[in-house]
Design a protein with these regions (language model features):
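Conserved acidic, metal-coordinating active-site core of Asp-based
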Residues: 102, 108, 113-223, 232
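Active-site phosphate-binding/coordination module
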Residues: 29-126
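Short, structured coil segments at secondary-structure junctions
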Residues: 66-67, 75, 168-171, 223-224, ...
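Short hydrophobic/aromatic-enriched beta-strand-loop microsegments
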Residues: 68-76, 89, 132, 175-177, ...
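Asp-based, Mg2+/Mn2+-dependent phosphohydrolase catalytic module
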Residues: 223, 227-228, 232-265
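Asp-based phosphoryl-transfer active-site loop
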Residues: 10-26, 221
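Short, Lys/Arg-enriched N-terminal segments with co-localized hydrophobic residues
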Residues: 1-7
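Hydrophobic "anchor" residues on beta-strands that sit immediately upstream
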Residues: 11, 70, 203, 209, ...
């Protein structure tokens, strides 16, 4: 079986949901085998980091629980190094305004994330009423208007598929659907954040290893990096992968690291 060169230090980036974490958004848990794998990777001398679409605030719990000090968050637009948030690049404000204006015109519920927190804001209760969402807390801010904020990090549009394809304004923004009740308007360029971290540490990008499962991981499945798709990954990601492991809840992280020789020091 093909293996990575044993003595070479690798820079390994893990997606969270569906990769490190199983159970979906409602019953998330980290498989014990994944925790063991992370410890063995550290013992082997590798650099470990998270690469998630979650906001930095929404990912901090897993970062601390699993002992990470470095993280790409916010779909590639947020960077945390040595435990300190460096920055988060917001979405293009005018693009977000156009999306929200179209939602208003079509009477589609919406919400915004205007700071790095675990709470999003909505102009009324319709977003929460529509979604019954437990992923993050939604607070009602009467008169909420994206034009009043300097920075907007994410927007959320409550709709069932295929409504999103009727929204012309979505053609100019990155977005994805991870839940049936709503879509996320959020950055989708994890490779951008990974390169920033590699530049900071002066490391060769050829030493990058990435683990992912979903459409927002496609941006980090690039040529020249070692790409591992979970068994539960979407087909498009598997087609780009160098190695396909077992499902997240079937020891996928551990099995891949063992198969690729990453535990060897």
């Amino acid at each position: 079986m093909w293996k990575i060169w044993r003595m070479k230090r690798k820079y390994i980036f893990f997606d969270i949901d569906g990769t490190l974490v199983a159970g979906g958004y409602n019953k998330t848990y980290v498989p014990e085998s994944a925790k063991v794998a992370l410890e063995k990777l550290r013992e082997a001398g590798h650099f470990l980091a998270i690469a998630t679409g979650r906001s930095q605030a929404m990912a901090l719990g897993y970062m601390h629980e699993l002992g990470f000090e470095n993280m790409v968050s916010d779909g590639g637009y947020g960077v945390t190094i040595n435990g300190e948030l460096v920055d988060i690049t917001p979405l293009n404000k005018q693009d977000v305004i156009r999306v929200i204006d179209e939602c208003k015109a079509k009477n589609i519920p919406w919400a915004l994330q205007v700071d790095n927190s675990v709470v999003r804001s909505a102009p009324d209760s319709r977003f929460q009423d529509f979604t019954n969402d437990v992923y993050m807390q939604t607070e009602v801010v009467e008169g909420l208007d994206p034009a009043n904020y300097d920075k907007i990090y994410k927007a959320y549009i409550a709709c069932y598929e295929p409504t999103e394809y009727t929204l012309e304004s979505l053609k100019s923004v990155p977005w994805g659907r991870f839940l049936k009740e709503y879509i996320f308007v959020e950055p989708s360029d994890k490779a951008f954040g990974i390169r920033r971290i590699m530049d900071y540490f002066g490391a060769e990008t050829s030493d990058v290893v990435v683990f992912g499962d979903a459409a927002n991981d496609l941006s980090m499945f690039v040529d020249g990096w070692t790409k591992v798709a979970m068994g539960n990954a979407i087909d498009e990601l598997k087609q780009r992968a160098d190695y396909i492991t077992t499902d997240v809840d079937k020891d996928g992280i551990y099995n891949a690291c063992e198969a690729l020789g990453l535990f060897n020091n």
